[in-house]
């Protein structure tokens, strides 16, 4: 059976390293499913939930919260370099919910003062918090 190696790397080190027979990622152009023997590719990634079907258990799905980055696919090695990434088992959902509340407050303040840069920062923080909550609840 053909498989690919999936690695998720952040500035803090390797966050994920397993064999898989399918992954799903999200780029600015939309969602992309990747199977073994995929063509070589480099693409940007958005804040999203990465879905991974591992080869060792066909009924198990791993979820990883990816907070932007790039994906490189070459010779059945899928490398994701991300600003930050967390597996579902490592996410503290209550902490993520507190981050969501903080981001919502910052967004309201930035919108009331018409600070475009702060609005964008708060929107990114909110997307990241919502992504972590979603993956943490899987």
Swiss-Prot record:
The record, for PANTHER family, names: ATP SYNTHASE DELTA/EPSILON CHAIN (PTHR13822), ATP SYNTHASE EPSILON CHAIN, CHLOROPLASTIC (PTHR13822:SF10)
What topology does the record note for this protein and the membrane?
A: Peripheral membrane protein
- Organism field: Streptococcus equinus
Q: Where is this protein localized, as stated in its record?
A: Cell membrane
By its UniProt entry, which Gene3D superfamilies does this protein fall under?
ATP synthase delta/epsilon subunit, C-terminal domain (1.20.5.440), F0F1 ATP synthase delta/epsilon subunit, N-terminal (2.60.15.10)
Molecular function terms in GO for this entry? Answer: ATP binding; proton-transporting ATP synthase activity, rotational mechanism
Q: Which domain of life is it from?
A: Bacteria
What UniProt keywords apply to this chain's record, in alphabetical order? ATP synthesis, Cell membrane, CF(1), Hydrogen ion transport, Ion transport, Membrane, Transport
* Gene of this entry: atpC
Protein family (similarity comment): Belongs to the ATPase epsilon chain family.
Q: Transmembrane residues, as ranges?
A: none
Q: Which Gene Ontology CC terms are recorded?
A: plasma membrane; proton-transporting ATP synthase complex
Cross-referenced HAMAP family? ATP_synth_epsil_bac (MF_00530)
Report what the protein is called.
Answer: ATP synthase epsilon chain
The protein's job, in short, is: Produces ATP from ADP in the presence of a proton gradient across the membrane.
Recorded hits in InterPro entries, A to Z, give: ATP_F1_dsu/esu_C_sf, ATP_synth_F1_dsu/esu, ATP_synth_F1_dsu/esu_N, ATP_synth_F1_esu_C, ATPsynth_dsu/esu_N
Instruction: Write down a Pfam family by its short name.
Output: ATP-synt_DE_N
Asked if the record carries the keyword Membrane, the reply is yes
NAD in keyword set: no
Q: How does it assemble?
A: F-type ATPases have 2 components, CF(1) - the catalytic core - and CF(0) - the membrane proton channel. CF(1) has five subunits: alpha(3), beta(3), gamma(1), delta(1), epsilon(1). CF(0) has three main subunits: a, b and c.
């Amino acid at each position: 059976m053909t498989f690919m190696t999936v690695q998720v790397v952040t500035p803090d080190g390797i966050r994920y390293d397993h064999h898989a027979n399918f992954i799903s990622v999200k780029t600015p152009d939309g969602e992309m499913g990747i199977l073994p023997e995929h063509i070589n590719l480099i693409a940007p990634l958005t804040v999203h939930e990465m879905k991974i079907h591992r080869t060792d258990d066909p009924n198990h799905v791993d979820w990883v919260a990816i907070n932007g980055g790039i994906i490189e696919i070459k010779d059945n090695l899928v490398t994701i370099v991300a600003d930050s990434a967390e597996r579902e088992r490592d996410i503290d959902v209550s902490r993520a919910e507190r981050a969501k509340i903080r981001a919502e407050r910052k967004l309201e303040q930035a919108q009331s003062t018409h600070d475009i840069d702060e609005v964008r920062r708060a929107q990114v923080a909110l997307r990241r918090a919502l992504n972590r909550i979603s993956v943490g609840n899987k």
